[in-house]
Amino acid sequence: MNQSLLTPYGTAFERVEAGLTAIREGRGVLVVDDEDRENEGDIIFAAETLTSEQMALMIRECSGIVCLCLTDERVKQLELPMMVENNTSANETGFTVTIEAAKGVTTGVSAADRVTTIKTAIADGAVPADLNHPGHVFPLKANADGVLGRRGHTEATIDLMRLSGLKPYGVLCELTNIDGTMARLPEVIVFGKKFNMPVLTIEDLAAYRLAKESNTVTNTTEEVAVIA
């Protein structure tokens, strides 16, 4: 990845902070992974603040496979089985069965219907009966350790939500070019400028977490020493 393209966005720490600010403001964030992995840029929105307009943007500008990133706890709460028992995909992406809201939708495919499905799935009191299967929203189960356990967009999404102080559920979709090819970093940056979305990398987020959590452990150890 050509890191020099990200220089205008500041340091890795500053890029993550800009992303967190955008999430808290209800805006989207663009997250890019490594060249030796998917080498793709995803649009990410917080599930709890997601609007029909934002969903329409993802449907229009992205691959169309809109995914809802969930924690293992939420997947269990909704009793969502994994899509396959033996996951042989290269990156072991944690797809569960697809979902549709049991109430409040028509065909389930419109932007408004997909938002309804997502809001239903992340509601505090959500139960399995609130969802039908199959559907037009693709849930993804995140690694419990976030990007420190798996360098994926799914985990980056959950980490961003948690660090932003929001519910740990987010929506992502892979950004594509007009010709249907996957958007790489140069195209992602152009898109970000057009739609006022900050750009960061999964490695930025991993470094941010390591620094923050290491600092927390150090401070806690010092406090214990003082008390002792």
Swiss-Prot record:
What pathway, per the record? Cofactor biosynthesis; riboflavin biosynthesis; 2-hydroxy-3-oxobutyl phosphate from D-ribulose 5-phosphate: step 1/1
Coiled-coil residues are none
SUPFAM superfamilies noted in UniProt = YrdC/RibB (SSF55821)
Q: Which cofactor does it need?
A: Mg(2+); Mn(2+)
Query: Might you give the EC number(s) for this enzyme?
Result: 4.1.99.12
Q: Recite the UniProt cofactor note for this protein.
A: Binds 2 divalent metal cations per subunit. Magnesium or manganese.
Q: Mind listing the GO molecular function terms for this protein? A: 3,4-dihydroxy-2-butanone-4-phosphate synthase activity; magnesium ion binding; manganese ion binding
One Pfam match, given by its short name, reads DHBP_synthase
Q: State where Mg(2+) 1 binds.
A: 38
Q: Where is this site: Essential for catalytic activity?
A: 136, 174
Homology family: Belongs to the DHBP synthase family.
Task: Please name the HAMAP family in this protein's record.
Answer: RibB
Q: What is this protein called?
A: 3,4-dihydroxy-2-butanone 4-phosphate synthase
